[in-house]
Amino acid sequence: MEELIQKALSSSNKVSNNSLIEKIIPVGGGCIHKAWSIHFQNGKRVFAKSNYIDTINMFKFERECLSVLKRFANESYICVPETIDLISYQNLSILFLEWIDLKQCQQNVLGKGLALLHKSSSEWSKKNFGWEEEGFIGSSTQAKG
């Protein structure tokens, strides 16, 4: 899998910034996608999620949602990762995100950030909660989710 990710990365300068890959390390935490920490020789580090190509719509939806959430996040309290690229390569889809070091986070600060995120996004859309389009919760489709 690491070899496929390396080959996929060769097609995207957005992720690598012309730097060579130093190492690709699997990281845990999810049950739908495989997750990776990718280290580049220039010191840059990114988070990647990979799955089969038929799940690319889940990644497209996640990319869109993260982009919108980032507008509402108060970065003094909570960070929403920047989406770097979404690549299709052979039978693989890979979503590349900004790496966020979670070891430096405090739960009470994250809780306040999450509350502020909900507040500011609900003020933007007073009609209701949810999303304008069909989406996903995990691998399940979600109507206006």
Question: Which stretches of residues belong to each language-model region?
Answer:
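ATP-binding pocket architecture of kinase catalytic cores
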Residues: 25-145
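Juxta-kinase regulatory segment immediately upstream of eukaryotic protein kinase catalytic domains
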Residues: 1-20
